[in-house]
Amino acid sequence: MKKQAGFTLIELVIVIIILGILAVTAAPKFLNLQNDAKTAAASGVLAAVQSSSQLVYSKAALEGVEASPSASVSSADNTTIAVVYGYPKASKDGIAKAVTIDGSWSSASSASETYSFAPVDAKEKADCVLYKGATDSAPATAVLGKINASKECAEAP
């Protein structure tokens, strides 16, 4: 009789079962795409806020109002943007007018001299962007934050 070289049906089934178990265990670690996309969107909004803030500051410097505690500048489309020490004010008349963000993100005033941008459907611990207005001793800043239990954007610890 001739000896056959190869795998039996039982051996193939066992290998397939083992591969299935490994795939179910390892796949979630590699398929965290939704959270990656949300983090990337927040980083994009952060970059837009920072860029808009710098562009408005440049415009304020050209108009000579960068040292004023309260002024306004006109954008290219004749929108008036409120500025504080040259940077957009942390309000809907300031940074919210300076930056253009699609409808999947909302904006709101937070604590004094802060303004936040968050996804419309944001849940607790979701990424958000927190804009802090300029003061006489510090420029405006924008940082990534997290939605807290009160559904407000706060700096990440």
Q: Which ranges hold each PLM region?
A:
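N-terminal single-pass transmembrane signal-anchor helix
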Residues: 1-37, 41
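Membrane-proximal N-terminal amphipathic helix
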Residues: 37-63
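Phosphate-binding glycine-rich loops and adjacent basic patches that engage nucleotide phosphates
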Residues: 7-16, 54-64
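General N-terminal targeting signals
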Residues: 18, 44-50, 66-68, 72-73
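Periplasmic/extracellular, small/polar-rich flexible segments of pilin-like filament-forming proteins
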Residues: 58-157
